[in-house]
């Protein structure tokens, strides 16, 4: 068996398990739109929230999902968000059905009562986020962050990175000055010198390194996992598992393609993001491909994230991460 054939079998096995019941419906030959019409629904679509980077951006750029779902009479609507927290706000209020975010946004959303479910994740990618300082900064170690102003997007993956970085350095969270800004505003503040450091993720991280010559004080390696999660509203996931199965299968195909075509990935991402190809090539070199079901190990990792925010009273209440899974599809096995 060839490596490429083994990859295809692995992808089919993994994603078949994700929505086995849906696969049975699809195998019966009844298109999704016909099923919807039988339920009295007029239009079937999936509204996808994405950020300006990653597998969903590649999927949008290649147009393969639209072609696949058109065969089932299903439309696709894409909405861009600047960061994970606002994307999940969109999911919670019903403006989108599905999207991808980092580790921390689902924790904040679940603690706020959002009715979302995890449906998959990409592998850990700790080098894709970092705390950076201006090229001429005198800050040399994480301990030097004490008393400093640090720009970050509240409730994002880098919020957790900052917690773990400070913990490693023995600096209390109360002893820094977090400045909560979305990426574009944070970059402006960083360039003006209004903040001393910036916790940020790719491709904004790569842009800061390439365009501003920002210096990495610490990235996520040895501190955080930095998984990328695919989430859906619980209502949509329960009602349309067959559509989500198709979406995740197409995500897996794009992951396989992206892993083997870095130059084409950089070309598509440059066009989609408006960033230079050198910037997105650097960012893409740190990205990990390979969507999987959410395993017990990943859920345990997410629970540690939740507990860290809860211990500092940064979320309104403790949460149990596994409550945000569909019970019949938890797939409580460790990821291979």
Model-derived segments and their meaning:
Residues 2-21:
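N-terminal secretory signal peptides and thylakoid transit peptides that target proteins
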Residues 239-316:
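Secondary-structure end/capping motifs
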Residues 104, 178-179, 184-271:
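Pocket-lining segment of extracytoplasmic ligand-binding domains
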Residues 23-35:
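C-terminal segment of classical bacterial N-terminal signal peptides
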Residues 66-74, 290-298, 321:
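Short, solvent-exposed loop/beta-turn-alpha elements that line the ligand-binding surface or hinge
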Residues 46, 55, 147-152, 192-195, ...:
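Second-shell loop/turn segments in exported
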Residues 307-336:
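Conserved C-terminal helix/tail region of periplasmic/extracytoplasmic solute-binding proteins
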Residues 37-171, 177-180, 196-200, 217, ...:
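Short, glycine-/small- and polar/acidic-enriched structural segments
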């Amino acid at each position: 068996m060839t490596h490429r054939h083994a990859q295809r079998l692995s992808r089919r096995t993994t994603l078949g398990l994700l929505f086995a019941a849906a696969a049975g419906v699809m195998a019966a030959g009844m298109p999704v739109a016909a099923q919807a019409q039988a339920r009295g629904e007029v239009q079937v679509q999936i509204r996808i929230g994405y950020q300006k980077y990653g597998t969903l951006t590649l999927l949008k750029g290649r147009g393969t999902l639209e072609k696949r779902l058109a065969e089932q009479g299903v439309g696709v609507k894409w909405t861009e968000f600047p960061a994970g927290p606002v994307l999940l706000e969109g999911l919670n209020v019903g403006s989108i059905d599905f999207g991808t975010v980092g580790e921390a946004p689902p924790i904040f959303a679940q603690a706020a009562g959002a009715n979302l479910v995890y449906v998959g994740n990409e592998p850990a990618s700790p080098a894709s986020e970092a705390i950076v300082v201006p090229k001429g900064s005198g800050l040399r170690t994480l301990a030097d962050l004490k008393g400093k102003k640090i720009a970050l997007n509240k409730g994002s993956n880098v919020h957790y990175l900052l917690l773990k970085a400070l913990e490693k350095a023995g600096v209390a969270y109360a002893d820094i000055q977090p400045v909560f800004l979305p990426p574009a505003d944070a970059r402006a503040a960083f360039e003006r010198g209004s903040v001393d450091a910036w916790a940020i993720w790719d491709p904004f991280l790569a842009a800061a390194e390439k365009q501003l010559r920002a210096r990495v004080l610490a990235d996520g390696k040895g501190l955080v996992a930095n998984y990328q999660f695919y989430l859906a509203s619980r209502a949509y996931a329960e009602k349309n598992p067959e559509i989500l199965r198709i979406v995740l299968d197409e995500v897996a195909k794009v992951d396989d393609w992206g892993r083997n075509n870095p130059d084409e990935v950089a070309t598509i991402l440059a066009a989609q993001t408006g960033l230079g190809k050198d910037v997105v090539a650097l960012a893409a070199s740190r990205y990990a491909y390979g969507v999987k079901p959410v395993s017990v190990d990943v859920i345990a990792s997410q629970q540690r994230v939740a507990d860290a925010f809860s211990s500092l009273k940064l979320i309104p209440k403790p949460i149990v991460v596994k409550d945000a899974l569909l019970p019949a599809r938890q797939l409580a096995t460790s990821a291979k």
